[in-house]
Amino acid sequence: FLMTTLASRDLRGIAFWLMGDLSTAPPPGLLWILVVCFAVAAGSIFTTASDLNLLLAGEREAMHLGVDVTRVKLVVYVSASVLTGLAVSVSGAIGYVGLLVPHVMRMLFGSDYRVLIPTSAIGGAIAVVLADTLARTIIAPTELPVGAMTAMAGAPVFIYLLRRGQS
């Protein structure tokens, strides 16, 4: 329905948002709300890193070591959902970044969540900036959606990780 009723420039904007687009910034009045929500959610996840390390041994073992497993799960699920919602509301859906970057960081830096969480966040930001730069320059002056670039790079890496895990 939308494709038949919207003007072509509106349709292009929707298509780019659906595939990821970093060409527009959030309105200034909304920016501080995004920053505060990001700081609270990211801070909440960072505070659970040690408990997440204990959860690697299993829920029962972590509970015996004093971890409130239900609380940690709730904090991580809610915080991750808020962070995902913030990112998608600003840039649209950019696939493969949240799936692949943490796996690559785990291969590079190990499984300690005190290291893995910040390196995954920084690695994801770097991956998105690189993908956006490629999307803007690869067929300049036309711009590709960022999600198209991450999919072209992410799909082969994902297949490699799947095959590596099976062997």
Summary of predicted features, one role per range:
Residues 1-167:
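Alpha-helical transmembrane segments in inner-membrane proteins
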